[in-house]
């Protein structure tokens, strides 16, 4: 277990960007984090970083700018994964997928208030992980297209002589 913990601590450092979908893992269980890293790499994703606590995750997000975040709900530190997700600046528009061993309604309701792009209840299959990431990225692209179209519409409306912008 010491080797896994040491390996996880070393991997908490920022990993330089590469081609592919950049996934950040927020998970405090070394075995789970290493399994996720292995599966994500096998699926062609790039693990941009691994954080074990909410405070560490928020700092790392600003450094690595991941395409998607896999966030365990129950992590070490002063804030859990739900609070951490709620503190990610909205302007970054980073999809968060919650990983949890908990499936009770109160936890899922609290998590849904942060508008996650998905949930995976542990244990989950690798194909479920891949499909959830794919759907989250597709939704993120659609959300970005909506934001761009809204901005274009706003500019068009503001250029009309009768508009008050």
Residue ranges and their predicted role:
Residues 50-59, 80-81:
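Helix N-cap/capping motif at the beta->alpha junctions
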Residues 64-71, 75:
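Active-site beta3 strand of CheY-like receiver
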Residues 26-27, 51, 69:
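Conserved sequence signature across two-component system core domains
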Residues 2-19, 34-35, 110-113, 146-165:
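PAS/LOV and related PAS-like sensory modules
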Residues 79-83, 90, 97, 103-121:
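Alpha4 helix (beta4-alpha4-beta5 surface) of REC/receiver domains from two-component response regulators
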Residues 129, 135-150:
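Interdomain signal-transducing alpha-helical coiled-coil linkers
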Residues 21-22, 29-49:
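Two-component/phosphorelay signaling modules centered on CheY-like receiver
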Residues 106, 120, 124-133:
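C-terminal output helix
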């Amino acid at each position: 277990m010491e080797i896994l913990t040491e390996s996880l601590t070393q991997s908490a450092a920022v990993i330089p960007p590469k081609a592919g979908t950049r996934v950040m893992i927020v998970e405090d269980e070394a075995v789970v984090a290493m399994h996720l890293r292995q599966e994500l790499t096998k699926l062609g994703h790039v693990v941009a970083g691994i954080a074990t606590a909410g405070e560490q995750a928020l700092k790392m997000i600003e450094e690595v700018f991941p395409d998607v975040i896999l966030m365990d709900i129950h992590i070490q530190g002063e804030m859990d994964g739900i609070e951490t997700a709620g503190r990610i600046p909205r302007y970054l528009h980073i999809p968060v997928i919650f990983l949890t061993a908990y499936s009770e309604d109160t936890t899922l309701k609290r998590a849904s208030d942060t508008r996650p792009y998905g949930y995976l209840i542990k244990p989950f299959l690798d194909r479920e992980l891949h499909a959830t990431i794919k759907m989250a990225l597709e939704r993120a692209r659609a959300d970005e297209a909506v934001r761009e179209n809204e901005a274009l519409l706003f500019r068009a409306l503001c250029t009309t002589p009768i508009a008050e912008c």
